[in-house]
Amino acid sequence: MEYNFPVTRTTHPKPRPADETKLGFAKYFTDHMFVMDYDEGQGWHDGRVVPHEPFLIEPASCVLHYAQMMFEGMKAYRTPDGGVQIFRPDMNIKRMARTNERMCIPELPGDLFLAAVKAVIEADRDWVPSAPGTAMYIRPFIFGDEVSFSVLPAKHYKFMIILSPTGSYYAANDGGLSTTRIYVQDKYIRAAHGGTGYAKVGGNYGGGMRASQDAMKYNCKDVLWLDAAEHKYVEEIGTSNAFFRIADEVITAPLDSGTILPGITRDSVIQLLKKWGVKVSERKLSIDEVVAASKDGSLQEIFASGTAAVISPIGWLNVMGTDVQVEDGTVGPVAQKLYDTLYGMQTGTVADDMGWTYRLL
């Protein structure tokens, strides 16, 4: 189906960042956003591109009280020929469908989603950065804004997309990769079996902020979550999936518990490693096994994967107050190769022999 969304241009364009090497993450927002409404009996309607600006919301809107919402995260990349492309949007669409089903949010057709992304990117195409390590972060989200205190699915929703030119999530001084410190604790959990861990919903992240604040006390950037049942098996790192290279095996937590977000970068990492002949296992891994591997020298690398950072190498863990160093604390070869390959594919500087990129403009 072909969609033609009306565009209302801003009359007060913002100054674009002067130095693309200092964008940071989500510090700037573009001139426009996409908005679309849903009403029960009518479906999705009135999609439009409008100026990015504050909007009114009724204080009794159900999202403010019962958190019926979802979001996605993706990036648009400037290619060497000046075009703009995105990475594996089919995976975002599938994950969005799973989240919507879990949260009782109406289905959003995949072709509509892609058309909306293209429309808002086209409106702000001059904002897409081109400096190394940069991209346009795309944040689609849906929330129920029916005015009601009833604990029931809303009958009215808004679908919106906002854009933010962004740099590297964890960048070294030269703009390349650097290692981070990660905190491991067994007091709080991210998700439990039967919950919303596999869905991309705000509550999963809001509920993790207490542990993230505790991590800062140990000079750590983020939290490595353990499982809810036994508090011993590694799951995710903050907003990312976690990988551990022990001896000749790369290990990541399995998805069958329903507590792990099925990351698009995670799937890409697994496929690339298998293509390169690296042994990859999706299995349970205890934090005790990780610590033991560090002591006997078999722990080669730990890294996180996600849309924001692509690949984020981990140099140290703080495990319940005790520091555990990963090899020599520097970026490992597998993490570096994965980053170079994935970011190269995303920006068009490395041939995409996997068919993962999607040209927008």
Question: PLM features: residue spans?
Answer:
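Charged, gly/pro-rich active-site loop segments
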Residues: 110-112, 120-133
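Extended, Lys/Arg-enriched charged tracts that mediate electrostatic binding to polyanionic substrates
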Residues: 129-139, 143
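Intrinsically disordered, low-complexity linker/loop segments enriched in Gly/Pro
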Residues: 123, 143-145
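Helix-start/capping segments and mature chain N-termini
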Residues: 1-120, 148-361
